[in-house]
């Protein structure tokens, strides 16, 4: 059976009645019982035929209670938090909790509704540095961060001492009228600090991009 009625899904943002991304639901009887209730399988497909989700539900979930407004992400009502209609989606897909919306936008790293493509007014706020260091992310990112910190602690004093020795040698050569050697040492010092700053900025940008993107949005 195929129908055009909107549905809400537990794992992906459900579709709504908009021409941007129409959804087709195919309901099939799977012939099994759960707590004495028959089940059906609902497959939700996008316009291009891509399968978005397969949901197994019991017929008991189809009750007048489910007609109440609920959040399309967590499927909870407005008892704990008010429901908002921030985008152009309608029906059961048009209401959502603010906290659920912020968490969804943060996880997907987007600033628009993926159903109706309405663009939200998003303000990105970087996470506090202490929280960033405490929870840097997955295990491989933690290892990368630890390696970069060790390299930084090792290279920084090495670059500082090397630069100081080069400048000291350049001053000594100037006193002995060896300008060519002095210019060479000064150029070496400049190149050393340029490479050091370039490496530091590159590593900082690489580490901060995935972590600081996990921001609070409003």
Swiss-Prot record:
Residues bound to Zn(2+) 1: 71, 74, 97, 100
Pathway: Protein modification; protein ubiquitination
Key words, A-Z: Cytoplasmic vesicle, Endocytosis, Endosome, Membrane, Metal-binding, Transferase, Transmembrane, Transmembrane helix, Ubl conjugation pathway, Zinc, Zinc-finger
Transmembrane segments: 145-165, 180-200
Reactions that this protein is recorded to catalyse: S-ubiquitinyl-[E2 ubiquitin-conjugating enzyme]-L-cysteine + [acceptor protein]-L-lysine = [E2 ubiquitin-conjugating enzyme]-L-cysteine + N(6)-ubiquitinyl-[acceptor protein]-L-lysine
Signal sequence range: none
Membrane topology: Multi-pass membrane protein
InterPro entries: Znf_RING, Znf_RING-CH, Znf_RING/FYVE/PHD
Family matches, as PANTHER family: E3 UBIQUITIN-PROTEIN LIGASE MARCH 2/3 FAMILY MEMBER, E3 UBIQUITIN-PROTEIN LIGASE MARCHF3
Record's subunit section: Interacts with MARCHF2 and STX6.
Name listed for the protein in its UniProt record: E3 ubiquitin-protein ligase MARCHF3
Organism: Mus musculus (Mouse)
């Amino acid at each position: 059976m195929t129908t055009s009625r909107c549905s809400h899904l537990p794992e992906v943002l459900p579709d709504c009645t908009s021409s941007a991304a129409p959804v087709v639901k195919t309901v099939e009887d799977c012939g099994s019982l759960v707590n004495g209730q028959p089940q059906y399988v609902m497959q939700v497909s996008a316009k291009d035929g891509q399968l978005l989700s397969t949901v197994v539900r019991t017929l008991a979930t189809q009750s007048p209670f489910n007609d109440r407004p609920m959040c399309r992400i967590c499927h909870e009502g407005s008892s704990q938090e008010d429901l908002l209609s921030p985008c152009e989606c309608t029906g059961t897909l048009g209401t959502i909790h603010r906290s659920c919306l912020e968490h969804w936008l943060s996880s997907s790293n987007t600033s628009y509704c993926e159903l109706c493509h309405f663009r939200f007014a998003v303000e990105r706020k970087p996470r506090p540095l202490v929280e960033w260091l405490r929870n840097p992310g997955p295990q491989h990112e933690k290892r990368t961060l630890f390696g970069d910190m060790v390299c930084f602690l090792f290279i920084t004093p090495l670059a500082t001492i090397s630069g100081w020795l080069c400048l000291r040698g350049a001053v000594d050569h100037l006193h002995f009228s060896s300008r060519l050697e002095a210019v060479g040492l000064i150029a070496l010092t400049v190149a050393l600090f340029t490479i050091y700053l370039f490496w530091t900025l590159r590593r900082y940008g690489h580490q901060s991009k995935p972590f600081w993107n996990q921001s609070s949005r409003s």
